[in-house]
Amino acid sequence: MGKHILLLPLGLSLLMSSLLALQCFRCTSFDSTGFCHVGRQKCQTYPDEICAWVVVTTRDGKFVYGNQSCAECNATTVEHGSLIVSTNCCSATPFCNMVHR
């Protein structure tokens, strides 16, 4: 009986973590239209993660690369040589990292 009592908190913990987890899109490489060419999947966030997507463009606005994931995320825009790398984060709704271009 003692084992059954110990399983209850574990079960509740797993239930709560699954309820708090956020579903996001995962894509290793998407194009300028947002179409995923490599690794189209869904992911579920772990604690401290949210939905994220990264877009790399040239200084004159030409699309170079994009990806989506579940990740620890800080929204930033960084210039690196002739490229601009924009990291975007969201957690408001499931699959909020859908890319519309």
UniProtKB/Swiss-Prot annotation:
Disulfide bridge positions per record: 24-51, 27-36, 43-70, 73-89, 90-96
GO CC field: extracellular region; plasma membrane
Chief location: secreted
Gene Ontology annotations of biological process type: negative regulation of activation of membrane attack complex
CDD domains given in the database record: TFP_LU_ECD_UP
Domain UPAR/Ly6: 22-99
Post-translational modification: N-glycosylated.
Protein's UniProt keywords contain Secreted: yes
A molecular function (GO) term: complement binding
Domain of life (superkingdom): Eukaryota
Residues carrying a glycan: 67, 74
Keywords from the UniProt entry: Disulfide bond, Glycoprotein, Secreted, Signal
Compartments, record wording: Secreted
Protein name: Urinary protein 2
